[in-house]
UniProtKB/Swiss-Prot annotation:
ATP binds at S110, Q111, S112, G113, T114, G115, K116, T117. Residues 97-264 form the Helicase ATP-binding domain. It catalyses: ATP + H2O = ADP + phosphate + H(+). Its EC number is 3.6.4.13. GO terms for biological process: poly(A)+ mRNA export from nucleus; protein transport; translational termination; tRNA export from nucleus. The gene is DBP5. Associates with the nuclear pore complex. A motif (DEAD box) lies at residues 211-214. It is an enzyme of class 3 (hydrolase). This is ATP-dependent RNA helicase DBP5. It comes from Mycosarcoma maydis (Corn smut fungus). Residues 275-451 form the Helicase C-terminal domain. ATP-dependent RNA helicase associated with the nuclear pore complex and essential for mRNA export from the nucleus. May participate in a terminal step of mRNA export through the removal of proteins that accompany mRNA through the nucleopore complex. May also be involved in early transcription.
Length: 456
């Protein structure tokens, strides 16, 4: 079982919080603060309170410092160990609402890199009774990779507490195994399987989180499994849904399953990729797409790059072919063995590999800060075969992370793929610039110049 236990307990606020916080804060240099890598929106966060009589602009619903939240010193230590000096805009508004008593449900729309993961992890850790060795907080993510990343945040933030944690993923826990960890991060299918087989007792759960909720609820199987998990929770359980995007159908569903929720939203235009220079390359056919990709290999390795494909077979075929030609690349998709998936994403995250060919399994939420270039080898489509602007947003959002600059390139090779890109360009109101593929030097120069701007 993937359970862990750390040092000291964190039950409630303490009198020497400010002294400890200021001491740790004083140790942070400007470089440390910069390294926390939070994206700050240029617009204010919009708050809609469940209590219509309450004023969302009241100081009661805003926290300019972590100390103002009344957190235990051990949680504050964890926050500062993560190099957060003050709450981001989304945290400033979300945390007072998430931590209020009695607990209230929340529907939150927030882009990756704004500190939303830290916000819901902090909520989970704050609700836990550290003397009760039972599951008390569960968060679900749509992919194994994202669940592991969330657990990394949880373990870092909780390292000064004695919380016990468990990753509820295939090959991490066995069916029927009894999980007593207080904080559980998992995927919907495995978590529901463990609940159904009596491996997880949900009677004491206080907080249930769906991350990337639009993905969960929009995909039929993940949505159904997530709802089954949610239906096992006590009625008093606080339900939190976070996502970068909330299409109307998903939002309506979220409101139904999280009644009386406070809401935090960014305007749709704020969920953009302003710092990412977007290009497209007009290829002759599928074979030409591969040839152009190979020509770009030297540019792919300047930083780190992700190549997104529509199918697992395509990802494997490209990776195999490029490897045979002497190029160092890795592929990642849901059909790989779990150990291979973990090893591949860890090597990429650690910077040991430079080029990753993937399906949408890492399109959402994955934080790999060194990614400077994303290629859409295939344009993203919905399950009904329509252009998928939201997945496109998530895909190219893997570069330009946390407000930094980045470059994305779309491959189009026929009228259909051109039409998909055109629909996405209009939906996102962005500009995608053509780069000629018949002049290698000009092609390399254009992309290199765009990549050079990243450091400026």
């Amino acid at each position: 079982m993937s359970e862990s236990k750390d040092k000291t307990t964190a039950p409630a606020a303490d009198s020497n919080v400010n002294e400890i916080a200021s001491g740790i804060s004083g140790l942070l240099s400007s470089k440390d603060v910069a390294e926390s890598n939070l994206r700050e929106s240029s617009h204010e966060v919009q708050v809609t309170l469940a209590d219509q009589q309450a004023d969302p602009n009241s100081p009661l619903y805003s926290a300019k410092s972590f100390e103002a939240l009344g957190l235990h010193e051990n949680l504050l230590k964890g926050i500062y160990a993560m190099k957060y000096q003050k709450p981001s805009k989304i945290q400033e508004k979300a945390l007072p609402l998430l931590l209020q008593n009695p607990p209230k449900n929340m529907i939150g729309q927030s882009q990756s890199g704004t500190g939303k993961t830290a916000a819901f992890i902090l909520t989970m850790l704050s609700r836990i009774d550290y003397d009760l060795q039972k599951p008390q907080a569960i968060a679900l993510a749509p992919s194994r990779e994202l669940a592991r990343q969330i657990m990394d945040v949880a373990r870092t933030m909780s390292k000064f507490t004695n919380v016990t944690t468990c990753l509820c993923l295939p090959d991490e826990v066995k069916r029927g195994e009894k999980i007593t960890a207080q904080l559980i991060i998992g995927t919907p299918g495995k978590t529901f399987d463990m609940i159904k087989s009596k491996g997880i007792d949900t009677a004491a759960i206080k907080v249930f989180v769906l991350d990337e909720a639009d993905n969960m609820l929009d995909q039929q199987s993940l949505g159904e499994q997530s709802i089954r998990v949610k239906n096992t929770m006590p009625k008093s359980c606080q339900l939190v849904l976070f996502s970068a995007t909330f299409p109307t159908n998903v939002y309506d569903f979220a409101v139904r399953i999280a009644p009386g929720a406070n809401e935090i939203r960014l305007k749709q235009e704020e969920l953009s990729v302003e710092g990412i220079k977007q290009f497209y390359m007009d290829c002759k056919d599928e074979d030409h797409k591969y040839e152009v990709l190979v020509e770009l290999y030297n540019l792919l390795t300047i930083g780190q790059s992700i190549i997104f494909c529509a199918k697992r077979e395509t990802a494997d075929r490209i990776a195999q072919k490029m490897t045979q030609e002497g190029h160092k690349v890795d592929s990642l998709h849901g059909r790989l063995e779990t150990a291979d998936r973990d090893r591949t994403i860890d090597a990429f995250r650690d910077g040991k590999s430079k080029v990753l060919i993937s399906t949408n399994v890492i399109a959402r939420g994955i934080d790999i800060q060194q990614v400077t270039l994303v290629i859409n080898y295939d344009m993203p489509l919905t399950q009904t075969g329509e252009a998928d602007a939201e997945t496109y947003l998530h895909r190219i959002g893997r570069t330009g992370r946390f407000g930094r600059k980045g470059v994305s390139i779309n491959f189009v090779h026929d009228q259909q793929s051109w039409s998909y890109m055109d629909q996405i360009e209009k939906a996102l109101k962005c500009q995608i610039t053509r780069v000629a593929t018949n002049d290698l030097e000009e092609m390399e120069y254009t992309i290199k110049e765009a990549l050079k701007q990243i450091g400026k």
